[in-house]
From Swiss-Prot:
Cofactor note: Glutathione is required for the prostaglandin D synthase activity.
Protein name per the record: Hematopoietic prostaglandin D synthase
Annotated GST N-terminal domain residues: 2-79
Xref: PANTHER family: GLUTATHIONE S-TRANSFERASE, HEMATOPOIETIC PROSTAGLANDIN D SYNTHASE
Reactions listed under catalytic activity: prostaglandin H2 = prostaglandin D2; RX + glutathione = an S-substituted glutathione + a halide anion + H(+); 2-glyceryl-prostaglandin H2 = 2-glyceryl-prostaglandin D2
InterPro entries: Glutathione-S-Trfase_C-like, Glutathione-S-Trfase_C_sf, Glutathione_S-Trfase_N, GST_C, GST_superfamily, Thioredoxin-like_sf
Length: 199
């Protein structure tokens, strides 16, 4: 088993999908959390100057979704066939495209709040409708077992619902999928013990 070290801020953010995958697979890793004040000093030492990064026996992988895809493949959560893997990737990329619309780093709180409200009110319904249609009456987004696409929906929707609690009320199937993910024993245990952070 390789030695894993995941480095990110003390947030769920873009590293949480990786933490879900580690938790579900029962893989030991170092969850290294940076404090914001330390970032200017550390940033020049990080490849491409962004986190998260995953060190695998000293080899550094950057980009959160590249890390997550690697972990999903290693833990059997990428999809059972090449087509399933492509579909799971497509769902993750669709959700990620939406999450990238938000001005997460905006310092002006009025500007940030207005932008968030606009996205959640005017753009989120289309995403939720499309995800609901894709899920249909299936238990999981892709195939007959859970994949990292289901985890990514749970991770991202947790953040979205913290900003607009009734966001998915019209989509009980998507909410039920969240419940199924969070009922998985390893995920439930991780959610219970993880540090409580805003995002």
């Amino acid at each position: 088993m390789p030695n894993y070290k995941l480095t990110y801020f003390n947030l769920r953010g873009r590293a949480e999908i990786c933490r879900y995958l580690f938790a579900y697979a029962g893989i030991k890793y170092e969850d290294h959390r940076l404090e914001g004040a330390d970032w200017p000093k550390i940033k020049p030492t990080i490849p491409f100057g962004k986190v998260p990064i995953l060190e695998v026996d000293g080899v550094i992988i950057h980009q959160s979704l590249a890390i997550a895809r690697y972990l999903a493949r290693e833990s059997g959560l990428a999809g059972q066939t090449p087509v399933e893997q492509a579909l799971a990737d497509a769902i993750v990329d669709t959700i990620d495209d939406f999450m990238m619309l938000f001005p997460w780093a905006e310092k002006n709180q009025d500007v940030k709040e207005k932008a968030f409200n606009d996205i959640l009110t005017n753009k989120a319904p289309e995403l939720l409708k499309d995800l609901d249609t894709f899920l249909g009456d299936k238990k999981w987004f892709v195939g007959k077992s859970v994949t990292w696409a289901d985890f990514y929906w749970d991770v991202c929707s947790t953040t979205l619902l913290s900003y607009k609690a009734d966001l998915a009320d019209k989509y009980p199937r998507l909410l039920a999928l969240r419940d199924r993910v969070e009922a998985l024993p390893a995920i439930a245990a991780w959610i219970q013990k993880r540090p409580k952070t805003a995002i």
